[in-house]
Amino acid sequence: MLTVPGLCWLCRMPLALGHWGICSVCSRAARTDKTLCPQCGLPATHSHLPCGRCLQKPPPWQRLVTVADYAPPLSPLIHQLKFSRRSEIASALSRLLLLEVLHARRTTGLQLPDRIISVPLWQRRHWRRGFNQSDLLCQPLSRWLHCRWDSEAVTRTRATATQHFLSARLRKRNLKNAFRLELPVQGRHMVIVDDVVTTGSTVAEIAQLLLRNGAATVQVWCLCRTL
């Protein structure tokens, strides 16, 4: 699937093993060196304890796993994936996220999910783009982790304004009742997968929907968290 098989997407040097698209040196360099809160994913004093923000007002999910801030070297790749139809990049980015998940499992005992779900696009946007980037991240993750993924588990009930230019308050209002759950999640350990989490409004709305319908736990996994 890679356009130049065996070359790293970031440094363009030959890969020593495999054809995942990002070499081990760049994989390590892409990870943030900041200490992040394990619950909200924002900079914190400790990486094993919830930050003060989460103690006062916890988000509607238990854990957030992210690779890095939304900045180079990952941000250009994510932009290519979403807006330049470079869907072949998705496997390389999924592997970065997988490595971060496995690291969190080794170091903090991260719970692996029963099911992972994508953040859905509105039908027209999905049609224009030709794919949902969250789906492309979920496909290999579900295979590698041996957990269920269904692209139709959560759907959008209506079109929403582009979140990028909205304040946090308007983002929350924009997304209210914008999602519908299509599958039972009672007692399930769920993970929401997205490419970038900014204010967290989108994943918060979906997490609340899952918890209202009986999900045991909810995590958020993303490539980048705007720090």
Swiss-Prot record:
Q: Which domain of life is it from?
A: Bacteria
SUPFAM superfamilies from the entry? PRTase-like
- Pfam family of this protein, just one? Pribosyltran
What InterPro entries does the entry give? ComF/GntX_DNA_util-trans, Competence_ComF, PRibTrfase_dom, PRTase-like
Could you tell me which CDD domains the record lists for this protein?
Answer: PRTases_typeI
Please describe what this protein does: Could be involved in gluconate metabolism.
Q: Which family does it belong to?
A: Belongs to the ComF/GntX family.
Q: What is this protein called?
A: DNA utilization protein YhgH
Whose protein is this, by species? Escherichia coli O6:H1 (strain CFT073 / ATCC 700928 / UPEC)
The gene for this chain is: gntX
